[in-house]
């Protein structure tokens, strides 16, 4: 029996819950207690909705639709539901037209998302093993040391001619391939710098279990530095220009 089915069975004696719904759209991560709480239902036929406490099975809120939004490009309408009046932390079900969907209210509700977003960069590291201590089942051997890289004819200059061998280890894989891009990763670093400048206290506290965790430097800065070191190797010392990418030949 899966978790969803179990919850429905436990609460069945108090409240008849509907089927898990793909019609109802809400914040899957949850809501802060004092935050606005809105859901969207992919139909214009909603007369009432109910919020049920998952722990007790009690109805804690019933409301009418806020408004119906008609699509300018189709004959479909969507109903907006507002349940911002619920502020108590806990797990709940939103019930609409016989369907239901679970959600949570708690402080720091988006912290898991922030942690996962930062940790994803560690998984993209090249040139070092991604160890089970930090990656669990996503561990893997080191990929692409990039300590012997050939300058492509399109990137050759007066000093560094085509075929020159350089070392350019580290950095992040761009996506599902083996390429490393200056522009793409520099954009990511720019966002990291901007958000750290705005919320330094948050990132001083954040720990996402990477090899550098606990070194008295925020994990965000450590992860950013891992790619910055690689970016420095992508600069042509003769003219200061920066190569666009490091990639396989084909």
Regions found by a protein language model. Give the residues of each.
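Hydrophobic h-region of N-terminal signal peptides that target proteins for export
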Residues: 10-18
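Low-complexity, Pro/Ser/Thr- and charge-rich linker/hinge segments at domain boundaries
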Residues: 23, 101-137
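Sec-dependent signal peptide recognition
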Residues: 1-10
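Catalytic cores of eukaryotic secretory-pathway lumenal/extracellular enzymes that build
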Residues: 52-54, 60, 69, 117, ...
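Extended ligand-binding groove/face enriched in aromatic
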Residues: 120-184, 206-250
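Ligand-binding face of N-terminal immunoglobulin V-set domains in extracellular IgSF glycoproteins
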Residues: 24-108
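Extended, Lys/Arg-rich, non-catalytic nucleic-acid recognition/anchoring regions
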Residues: 188
């Amino acid at each position: 029996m899966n978790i969803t089915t179990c919850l429905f069975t436990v609460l069945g004696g108090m409240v008849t819950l509907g089927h898990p719904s793909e019609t109802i759209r809400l914040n899957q991560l949850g809501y802060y207690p004092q935050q606005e709480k809105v859901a969207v239902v992919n139909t214009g036929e909603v007369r009432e909705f109910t919020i049920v406490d998952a722990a007790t099975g009690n109805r804690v809120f019933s409301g009418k639709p806020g408004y119906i939004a008609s699509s300018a490009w189709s004959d479909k309408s969507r109903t907006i539901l507002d349940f911002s009046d619920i502020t108590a932390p806990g797990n709940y079900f939103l019930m609409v037209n016989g369907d239901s969907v679970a959600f949570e209210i708690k402080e720091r509700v988006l912290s898991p998302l922030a942690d996962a977003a930062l940790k994803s960069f560690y998984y993209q590291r090249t040139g070092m093993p991604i160890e089970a201590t930090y990656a669990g089942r996503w561990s893997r051997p080191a990929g692409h040391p990039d300590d012997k890289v050939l300058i492509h004819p399109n990137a050759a200059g007066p000093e560094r001619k085509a075929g020159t061998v350089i070392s350019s280890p580290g950095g992040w894989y761009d996506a599902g391939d083996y390429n490393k891009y200056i522009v793409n990763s520099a954009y990511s670093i720019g966002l990291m710098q901007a958000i750290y400048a705005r919320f330094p206290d948050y990132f001083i506290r954040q720990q996402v279990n990477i090899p550098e965790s606990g070194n008295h430097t925020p994990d965000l800065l450590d992860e950013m530095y891992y790619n910055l070191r690689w970016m420095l190797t992508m600069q042509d010392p003769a003219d200061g220009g920066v190569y666009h990418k490091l990639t396989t030949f084909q």
